[in-house]
């Protein structure tokens, strides 16, 4: 589906057929037509195009496939965009060599050619075509001349009928933009449809990308008004745009990173949960409606002196349970993972109560030392200047150098009051912090969580999605496509608050949020502003046990997560849209917006709404698209054939729908509460052998910038199943080195099976390992060079002792466990051989026998038809286990009821369906159903209405009354 790509600065359409040089269309009357008088090469990487009226346009090449178009009709020369305060979008070294740069005139066109692209400019109209020389396809074509208006520049490109568009930054609730318009604007809007961290960059499946080189807001319309046009504009009075031409998403993202910098690789502790609150300002007074503390009493918090106990960072004033230290101990007492802590909120809290800045720094250092002793790093919120100002009181003074150098701060979270202006303001601030953290922090890797980002933010910081309200399903729903879209925009490091910063008091939403975010980079408990305390144990059982389970699972998956995080620095993001691995018409749009791939092997389908939930939160999930191939339920081991859309997938409260691709190789670690608890002398690989597969595991010191200099270790792991059902797993010698690398490690394999293999053997280099069979799990754990057949692995390993949930039996599919003694993993390959391998789970869906008749009375009744939804119904069929519907070329399967809702349809459009019954003997004949959606309820609404109020808008902009978005009503 992906064509070779070019990043262009003009309105270009994507077209793939051959074309004549004179075939560029005439411009629309009234637009600013410019004739081309000539062109000349002004240096080895740039061409100046001379237009009539003594105007000039520069094409500056940053490589054979990336060029910049600059035009300022007021006479300005090529330059960086204006930035106050100073900031740069481009990385320090954004250029690559240009192998050739030729300028010719052929007929009615000026032709500019490099080793990879050809740009043809019509002399009469100055309209462009950009051709990828790899296959001579037109990847972008300008549809109309550049239009300069007062404070605004725009142009348009042609769009192909099968072309899709992605990017634009954190566009809440969206990732696929075909037929839509997106704002490249810092709206500080944290809900669906808003823009949290815009990026002036998009790319197309047609093979090109565009990045506007500006700090001004803009708008990109991908055919919302004119189906075959892409209209682009920014509030800038000159044109400065980069075009990239390349083959597919990874290549285009790499082009973007070449220009603006690669995303940061988060330190390892960042993958553990963080806790954020203020512990240096408030007063706590006993109140029966307050929060329950360890002394058995309830207290309410106040920012004003209410006669209660004043909190502090270190609990030295007989206020321990209200201190920052108590947070560290509280997580430990509840056996909950915690990687980092922010003890100030930046809004009047500070981090000390002395009358000098140095005294407060010492107070912060005391907490940091205590936290690090317990494996936890310390960070700070920032809503004010980073450097000392004499006019500010000691309480609120900041000195980022001393905070990093003396107190050991290793995390920084920006806030609206500091970077809320966005654009260059936000980029300037995090640039300063990143450099200080590395320089004064012993080459520490910066861990910055920012908001209001822009192009270039990714090279310094991850992104936070803003202040949202928890306790509601909408909070989970819109974040799923938001996270996907962030990765497609070149920002793979995205996070949001666990169950929101505000609201709460809904343990079911809380648990479901912890579950799906296990398969995301970062987790933040933003405490102190919600309806309940924001701890993973806040709601008691069974929620505490389930949250602990998923937090421990996240820690076990760190080697996998860290490997795909390193890949995201120059390749695919960690959280992947389905089309990145499985491009087809179904995945390219928004049909799969509520599921994603976590790296190459995990498919995650979060519970984002109540479908058929009982009072305990046990539910089902509809609409899970499993691509071609075989997929395995990560918890139960059930096998699913791909190429279908599964429905009524069981999701009891403890279970997140997660599927593993058959053939997966998953590097793991021992469960831990922080990085210090990871066993550096053990490596674990869980495998689902199928065909021939491989995975490269990446590791480094996890804390410094040395990875940028290549200080890291890569280990290739291969798995192969032969035609005799014998498995060979080869762990190749580790390649590379880093400070602290432990070469001598034990190796553990977890092979998923459905019956005990007939033979197990292992070799390290040329030496065979004498394996013994363990007679129990305890025996296996206590020895080395052993194997054990675990018939029913206990998945419920982390329940609270004595809780009812601890008694719940949750078993997975059988596993063959193999543990080899420590050896030098750089010296020789480790090879595991398994004879008589079987992974053939019992059928769970097709259980009944008997003849099946075609479903009767299949129809969409009047009450089941709406403008954007249709719900076919039918009569139950005897002997049926489930039903299938064919719709839009896709097969919807495992439908347990006799109705099914189709959403996101077009108004006043006819649709056809086919329904059949299924059991283990086969399926019935199809029954056809036809229906038409009803009229658009906004059909006669008048577009373009604007309004104003005589007083300041409260909560939301008045524009939401007129924006045609029903969710804003």
Question: Which ranges hold each PLM region?
Answer:
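N-terminal accessory segment at the very beginning of proteins
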Residues: 21-268, 307-310, 314, 321-323, ...
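Catalytic-domain carbohydrate-binding cleft regions of carbohydrate-active enzymes
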Residues: 24-29, 136-656, 661
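Short beta-strand segments within Ig-like beta-sandwich modules, predominantly Fibronectin type-III
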Residues: 561, 891-897
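Predominantly extracellular/luminal regions of secreted and cell-surface proteins
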Residues: 676-695, 937-964
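Pro/Thr/Ser/Gly-rich low-complexity, intrinsically disordered linker/stalk tracts
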Residues: 846-878, 907, 925-938
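Short beta-strand elements bearing conserved aromatic residues within extracellular beta-rich modules
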Residues: 883-885
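Hydrophobic core positions of the immunoglobulin-like beta-sandwich fold
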Residues: 900-903
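Beta-strand-rich modules
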Residues: 905-921
């Amino acid at each position: 589906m992906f064509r070779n790509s070019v990043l262009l600065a003009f309105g270009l359409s994507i077209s793939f057929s051959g074309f004549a040089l004179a075939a560029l269309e005439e411009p629309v009357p009234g637009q600013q037509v410019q004739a081309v008088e000539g062109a000349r090469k002004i240096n080895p990487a740039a061409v100046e195009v001379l237009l009539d009226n003594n105007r000039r346009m520069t094409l500056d090449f940053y490589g054979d496939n990336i060029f910049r178009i600059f035009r300022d009709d007021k006479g300005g020369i090529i330059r960086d965009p204006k930035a106050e305060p100073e900031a740069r979008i481009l990385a320090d070294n954004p250029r690559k060599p240009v192998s050739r740069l030729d300028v010719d005139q052929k007929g009615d066109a000026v032709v500019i050619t490099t080793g990879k692209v050809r740009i043809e400019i019509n002399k009469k109209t100055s309209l462009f075509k950009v051709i990828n020389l790899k296959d001579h396809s037109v990847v972008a074509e300008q549809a109309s001349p550049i239009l300069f208006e007062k404070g605004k520049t725009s142009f348009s490109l042609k769009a192909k009928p099968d072309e899709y568009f992605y990017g634009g930054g954190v566009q809440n609730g969206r990732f696929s933009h075909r037929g839509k318009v997106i704002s490249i604007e810092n709206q500080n809007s944290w809900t669906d449809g808003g823009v949290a961290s815009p990026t002036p960059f998009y790319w197309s499946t047609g093979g090109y990308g565009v990045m506007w080189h500006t700090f001004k807001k803009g708008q990109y319309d991908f055919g919302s008004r004119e189906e075959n046009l892409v209209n682009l504009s920014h509030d800038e009075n000159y044109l400065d745009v980069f075009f990239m031409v390349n083959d597919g998403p990874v290549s285009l993202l790499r082009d973007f990173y070449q220009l603006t910098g690669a995303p940061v690789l988060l330190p390892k502790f960042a993958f553990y949960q963080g806790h954020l609150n203020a512990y240096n300002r408030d007063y706590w007074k006993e109140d029966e409606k307050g929060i329950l503390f360890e002394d058995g009493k309830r207290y309410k918090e106040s920012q004003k002196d209410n006669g209660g106990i004043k909190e502090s960072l270190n609990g030295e004033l007989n206020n321990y349970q209200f201190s920052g230290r108590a947070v560290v101990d509280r997580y430990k007492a509840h056996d909950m993972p915690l990687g980092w802590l922010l003890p100030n909120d930046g809004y009047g809290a500070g981090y000390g109560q002395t009358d000098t800045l140095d005294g407060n720094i010492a107070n912060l250092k005391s907490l940091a030392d205590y936290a690090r002793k317990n494996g936890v790093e310390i960070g700070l919120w920032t809503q004010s200047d980073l450097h000392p100002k004499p006019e500010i009181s000691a309480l609120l003074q900041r000195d980022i150098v001393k905070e990093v150098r003396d107190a050991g701060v290793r995390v920084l979270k920006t806030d609206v009051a500091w970077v809320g202006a966005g654009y260059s303001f936000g980029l300037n601030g995090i640039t300063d912090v990143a450099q200080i953290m590395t320089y004064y922090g012993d080459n520490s890797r910066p861990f910055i969580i920012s908001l209001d980002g822009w192009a270039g933010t990714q090279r310094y910081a991850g992104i936070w999605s803003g202040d949202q309200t928890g306790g509601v399903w909408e909070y989970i729903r819109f974040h799923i496509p938001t996270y996907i879209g962030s990765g497609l925009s070149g920002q793979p490091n995205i996070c949001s608050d666990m169950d929101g910063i505000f609201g709460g008091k809904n343990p079911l939403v809380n648990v479901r949020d912890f579950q799906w975010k296990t398969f995301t980079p970062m987790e933040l408990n933003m405490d102190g502003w919600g309806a309940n305390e924001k701890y993973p144990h806040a709601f008691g059982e069974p929620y505490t046990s389930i949250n602990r389970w998923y937090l421990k699972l996240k820690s076990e998956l760190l080697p996998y997560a860290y490997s795909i995080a390193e890949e995201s620095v120059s390749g695919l993001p960690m959280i992947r849209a389905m089309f990145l691995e499985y491009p087809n018409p179904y995945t390219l749009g928004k049909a799969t917006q509520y599921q994603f791939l976590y790296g190459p092997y995990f498919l995650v389908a979060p519970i984002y709404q109540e479908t058929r939930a009982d009072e305990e939160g046990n539910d089902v999930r509809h609409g899970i698209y499993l691509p071609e191939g075989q997929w395995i339920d990560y918890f139960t081991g059930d096998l699913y054939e791909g190429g279908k859309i599964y429905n009524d997938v069981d999701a009891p409260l403890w279970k997140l729908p997660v599927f593993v691709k058959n053939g997966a190789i998953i590097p793991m670690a021992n469960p831990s509460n922080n990085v210090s608890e990871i066993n550096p002398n053990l490596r674990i690989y869980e495998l689902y052998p199928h065909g021939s597969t491989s995975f490269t595991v990446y590791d480094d010191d996890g804390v410094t910038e040395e990875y940028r200099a290549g200080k890291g270790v890569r280990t290739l792991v291969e798995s192969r199943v032969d035609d005799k059902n014998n498995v060979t797993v080869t762990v190749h010698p580790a390649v590379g080195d880093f400070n602290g690398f432990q070469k001598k490690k034990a190796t553990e394999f977890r092979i998923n099976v459905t019956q005990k293999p007939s033979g197990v053997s292992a070799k390290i280099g040329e030496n065979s390992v004498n394996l013994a069979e363990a007679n129990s799990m305890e025996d296996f754990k206590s020895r080395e060079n052993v194997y054990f057949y675990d018939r029913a692995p206990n998945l419920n390993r982390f329940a609270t002792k004595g809780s009812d949930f601890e008694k719940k039996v949750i078993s997975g599919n059988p596993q063959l466990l193999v543990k080899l003694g420590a050896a030098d993993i750089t010296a020789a390959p480790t090879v595991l051989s398994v004879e008589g391998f079987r992974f053939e789970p019992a059928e769970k869906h097709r259980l009944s026998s008997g003849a099946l008749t075609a479903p009767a009375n299949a129809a969409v009744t009047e009450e089941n038809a709406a403008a954007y939804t249709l719900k076919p119904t039918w009569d139950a069929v005897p002997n049926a286990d489930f039903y299938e519907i064919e719709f839009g070329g896709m097969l919807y399967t495992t439908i347990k009821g006799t109705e099914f809702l189709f959403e996101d349809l077009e108004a006043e459009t006819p649709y056809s369906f086919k329904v059949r019954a299924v059991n283990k003997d086969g399926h019935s004949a199809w029954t056809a159903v036809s229906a038409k959606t009803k009229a658009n309820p906004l059909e006669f609404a008048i577009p373009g209405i604007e309004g104003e109020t005589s007083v300041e808008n409260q909560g939301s902009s008045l524009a939401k009354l007129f924006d045609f978005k029903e969710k804003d009503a």
